[in-house]
Amino acid sequence: MVARHFSFFLALLILYDLIPSNQGVEINPTIIKQVRKLRMRCLNQTGASVDVIDKSVKNRILPTDPEIKCFLYCMFDMFGLIDSQNIMHLEALLEVLPEEIHKTINGLVSSCGTQKGKDGCDTAYETVKCYIAVNGKFIWEEIIVLLG
């Protein structure tokens, strides 16, 4: 279960293809392969555009495309961070993330919890939108860069 949550954390970074080879981040190649496979599965399943994702990261704007919303849901679902009732469980990442960012994660969980939407895709999107509103700097500069 811990590996599954850690893989999700990596998935966010890999999702945006932002891990530079010179960053010094050592990631198990097996995990990268697994995450990329799940990323492709979610891209194929939802029809989300890699170009739209890349542009959103570059411009720090969360796209409102239904496919992107469902892509977020798919990734959260694949890594066990959203349950069958569409409740987010970001706090599960505390098991695998460095202690120095626990306070930030707890702040996001406390401030946002689960932002209910009309369905799972919309719930994932609204919750991520809240995370960005509460601590966009952390989401865009720390999470996305680490996972990229």
Swiss-Prot record:
Transmembrane segments: none annotated. Expressed in the antenna, mostly on the anterior surface of the third antennal segment. Expressed in auxiliary cells and the third antennal segment and exported to the sensillar lymph (at protein level). One of its GO terms (cellular component) is extracellular region. GO terms for biological process: courtship behavior; olfactory behavior; response to pheromone; sensory perception of chemical stimulus; sensory perception of smell. Pfam families: PBP_GOBP. Disulfide bonds join C42-C74, C70-C121, C112-C130. Induction: Expression is inversely regulated in male and female in response to the male-specific pheromone cis-vaccenyl acetate (cVA) and is dependent on the active neurotransmission of cVA-sensitive neurons to second order olfactory neurons. Belongs to the PBP/GOBP family. This is General odorant-binding protein 69a. It comes from Drosophila melanogaster (Fruit fly). The gene is Obp69a.
